[in-house]
Amino acid sequence: MANHSSAKKAARQTVKRTLINKARSSAIKTFIKKVVHEISLGNKENANLALSVAQSKIMQGVKKNIIKLNTASRKISRLSKQIKSLNESK
């Protein structure tokens, strides 16, 4: 356990930051799941709308250091590829 007051404060801040980061990470995952769900249903328009929202949230996560830029780019690229194949197939 921390003995110095500054160390105690840092421990409190870490707990607070961890909760915020977990909430943001969970929100990003939820938006990604919404895109995947719309793709599985075959809704082109809804999938495109969900992707634009998810892309925005993912990039906000990058800005807040929740996920790394390459990870975000990979996720967006894979979702875009799935939507593109959905649009071409039907």
Curated annotation (Swiss-Prot):
- Which GO biological-process labels does this protein carry? translation
Q: What is a single molecular function from GO for this protein?
A: small ribosomal subunit rRNA binding
Q: Which SUPFAM superfamilies match?
A: Ribosomal protein S20 (SSF46992)
Origin, by domain of life?
Bacteria
For this record, the Gene Ontology CC terms, alphabetical, are: small ribosomal subunit
Q: Name one Pfam family in it.
A: Ribosomal_S20p
| Keyword list, A-Z | Ribonucleoprotein, Ribosomal protein, RNA-binding, rRNA-binding
Report the SS bond pairs: none
HAMAP family, alphabetized: Ribosomal_bS20
Q: Which family does it belong to?
A: Belongs to the bacterial ribosomal protein bS20 family.
The entry's function note states:
Binds directly to 16S ribosomal RNA.
Annotated protein name in UniProt:
Small ribosomal subunit protein bS20
The organism is Rickettsia akari (strain Hartford)
